[in-house]
Regions:
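Glycan-recognition and catalytic cores of secretory/periplasmic carbohydrate-active enzymes
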Residues: 1-197
């Protein structure tokens, strides 16, 4: 099972490690990983959920795409390889297609039909507070290129917290639901803290 989302997290971890120890092996590993993500995107037309037994999934999730965008931009910040910056911009542009007018995210796109979808059967196939974390690559790219449109989009995404926030301050997993999920609540808080910073 190959899982692109965790690959994005790994690229972010490499930046953390490189900041501690300027080991050139970290850069070599990061280049191989970023090249794999670029090839995956070019082959499938998006950041797919995963590959099971050599069979790729044809669904691209906004959340996974944002984690890969963040990882690629993190790696760019240590590698200074413009190819990674260009791919990070491409992923952020792809993310913009998932954003609804109210700042919430459509959860997934079927790459076969080129249609956005949502399903009430699985928590991650619905709009949720977890998508507030998708603001992070918008803020990060803004820090790199100072494009104020990116800053505004990141803020608009974070402002969706009020759609999910309960009277006690917690965040509901989905719109107009009472279910609280610690995992997704942490994602929402992470996106808000990143935006605040």
């Amino acid at each position: 099972f190959l899982y692109p989302e965790i690959t994005g997290y790994f690229l972010s971890s490499l930046r953390f490690l490189y900041d501690i120890e300027k080991n050139p092996l970290i850069l070599d590993l990061g280049e191989k990983i970023s090249n794999w993500l670029i090839q995956l995107f070019d082959t499938h037309g998006g950041i797919i959920q995963g590959i099971y037994s050599s069979v790729p999934q044809n669904l691209s999730y906004s959340f996974d795409t944002s984690i890969c965008a963040k990882g690629i931009l993190d790696f760019y910040q240590i590698s200074k390889n413009e190819k990674n910056l260009d791919f990070g911009k491409k992923l952020v542009s792809e993310l913009e297609l998932f954003i609804e007018n109210d700042g919430t995210f459509r959860p997934l796109k079927n790459l076969r039909s080129n249609q956005f979808e949502e399903s009430k059967k699985l928590w991650y196939k619905q709009k949720g507070c977890l998508h507030i974390k998708c603001a992070m690559p918008f803020f990060q790219l803004y820090e790199i290129n100072k494009n104020k449109d990116l800053l505004k989009k990141g803020c608009d995404i974070c402002d969706t917290y009020s759609k999910f926030q309960n009277p006690d301050g917690s965040f509901s997993l989905h719109l107009e639901k009472n279910t609280i999920n610690l995992h997704t609540l942490c994602y929402a808080v992470e996106g808000l803290l990143y935006g605040y910073n």
